[in-house]
Amino acid sequence: MFTEKFLEVLENEGVVSIVTCANNEAHVSNTWNSYLVIVEENKILIPAAAMINTENNININPNVKLTLGSRNVMGYRYMGTGFLLEGTARFLKEGDHFKMMKDKYPFLTRVLEVTVSACKQTL
């Protein structure tokens, strides 16, 4: 599911935008590339300390979009590339993935699990 170029972007710091929508209103929260942990073939785990509006929206509508990128990775023609991810999400408060992430990021209160259905390079 995830290309070598995508994995290269994750190795470079950059901002990740997480877009949710409920009640006809979009909400955007942010995190960092370095916080994304890939598990299984199409799942990404993200530590969550706040993300209250994100969680409320996901409880109503689990569809999410994420964008991320790095100016340090070669794109189609020039330096800098980005990706658009689409999928569904849920928050984990227990289980093996939660424990693994809590050990790695002690500040988290929950883990955002994104099941990616599409990963498209945009630059």
How would you name each of these model-derived features?
Residues 1-123:
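Binding-site signature for planar aromatic cofactors or substrates
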